[in-house]
């Protein structure tokens, strides 16, 4: 199956100053595009950039929030990956991005965390070898991105698939001309701590994060301030992944009909609170954080992830 990117829906162009800019984000699983880069992808797309998200697996090893689709998990029906395609398409539509799967949908399987038996599955992404890099070279050659976004060498929090996404991104980028900058999505320690401190009461059944429990970085090379429109798009793209994410703003869905409410003391630091299936309360911050992984440095007055690039 071809890896060709497909347009997933219309988008609203607010400004056209980034027309001609081509951006590719390489992510491990459905929902990563929303959690780590949703604001930047929407920011770029609504300013006219051509934005594509390459997703490497279907996220088959994920747990499920809510009772509705619990039996889709890998230990039961093993149908979660197909369901998450639908969630991803909804998220990309909200962000205004195109999407494709590395090697085609289902070629590579979610490896799970270190030590998970899924590491040994024959289609496990950690076992993808040279083929995955070749597939990404094909995509980069076709799309000719100026800007590429992925994770750092640790994958952000140590997940083997995130680390593998980093490896193939840098390997492929070194073989394709025209890529001017690679960014690594990270979580800035200062903003994260401020957001966690602002959460005064977590929803019933949730818990507060322990000290240093959530992965974060001291080094931030660029922080993107999300305006109201970009922030709203990020939250809604996260909400689209309802099997994986729970937004504590009272919203419900067919997937998760249970409302959750969090209380915060500083809405600038934590306007919205969410949790993964571990039910650890986290802030959706007003800034996204990035490290420069390779290529053109940011100008001192940079306000956008493509500032300083030429196209």
UniProtKB/Swiss-Prot annotation:
Zn(2+) binds at residues 29, 32, 162. It catalyses: 1D-myo-inositol 2-acetamido-2-deoxy-alpha-D-glucopyranoside + H2O = 1D-myo-inositol 2-amino-2-deoxy-alpha-D-glucopyranoside + acetate. GO terms for biological process: mycothiol biosynthetic process. Keywords: Hydrolase, Metal-binding, Zinc. Disulfide bonds: none annotated. Its cofactor is Zn(2+). Binds 1 zinc ion per subunit. GO terms for molecular function: N-acetylglucosaminylinositol deacetylase activity; zinc ion binding. InterPro entries: GlcNAc_PI_deacetylase-related, LmbE-like_dom_sf, Mycothiol_biosynthesis_MshB. Gene3D superfamilies: LmbE-like. Its EC number is 3.5.1.103. Belongs to the MshB deacetylase family. Catalyzes the deacetylation of 1D-myo-inositol 2-acetamido-2-deoxy-alpha-D-glucopyranoside (GlcNAc-Ins) in the mycothiol biosynthesis pathway. PANTHER family: 1D-MYO-INOSITOL 2-ACETAMIDO-2-DEOXY-ALPHA-D-GLUCOPYRANOSIDE DEACETYLASE, N-ACETYLGLUCOSAMINYL-PHOSPHATIDYLINOSITOL DE-N-ACETYLASE-RELATED. This is 1D-myo-inositol 2-acetamido-2-deoxy-alpha-D-glucopyranoside deacetylase. It comes from Corynebacterium efficiens (strain DSM 44549 / YS-314 / AJ 12310 / JCM 11189 / NBRC 100395). The lineage of its organism: Bacteria, Bacillati, Actinomycetota, Actinomycetes, Mycobacteriales. The gene is mshB.
């Amino acid at each position: 199956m071809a890896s060709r990117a497909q347009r997933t829906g219309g988008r609203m162009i607010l400004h056209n100053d980034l027309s001609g800019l081509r951006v590719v984000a390489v992510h491990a699983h459905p929902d990563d595009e929303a959690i780590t880069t949703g604001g930047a992808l929407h920011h770029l797309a609504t300013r006219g950039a051509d934005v594509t998200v390459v997703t490497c697996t279907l996220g088959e090893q994920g747990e499920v929030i809510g009772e509705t689709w619990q039996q889709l998990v890998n230990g039961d029906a093993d149908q979660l990956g197909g369901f998450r395609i639908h969630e991803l398409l909804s998220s990309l539509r909200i962000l205004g991005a195109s999407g494709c799967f590395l090697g085609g949908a289902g070629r590579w399987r979610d490896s799970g965390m270190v030590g998970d038996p899924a590491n040994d599955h024959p289609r496990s992404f950690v076992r993808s070898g040279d083929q995955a890099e070749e597939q990404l070279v094909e995509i980069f050659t076709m799309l000719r991105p100026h800007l590429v976004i992925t994770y750092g060498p640790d994958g952000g929090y140590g997940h083997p698939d995130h680390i593998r996404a980093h490896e193939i991104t840098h390997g492929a980028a070194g073989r394709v001309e025209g890529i001017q900058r690679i960014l690594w999505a990270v979580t800035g320690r200062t903003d994260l701590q401020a957001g966690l401190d602002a959460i005064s009461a977590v929803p019933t059944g949730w818990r507060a994060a322990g000290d240093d429990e959530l992965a974060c970085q001291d080094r931030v090379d660029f922080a993107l301030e999300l305006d109201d429109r970009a922030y709203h798009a990020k939250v809604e793209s996260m909400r689209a992944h309802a099997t994986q994410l729970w937004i504590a703003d009272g919203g419900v869905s067919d997937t998760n009909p249970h409302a959750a409410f969090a209380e915060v003391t500083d809405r600038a630091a934590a306007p919205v609170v969410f949790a993964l299936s571990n039910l650890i309360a986290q802030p959706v911050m007003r800034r996204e954080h990035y490290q420069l992984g390779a290529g053109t440095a940011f100008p001192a007055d940079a306000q956008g992830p493509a500032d300083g690039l030429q196209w």
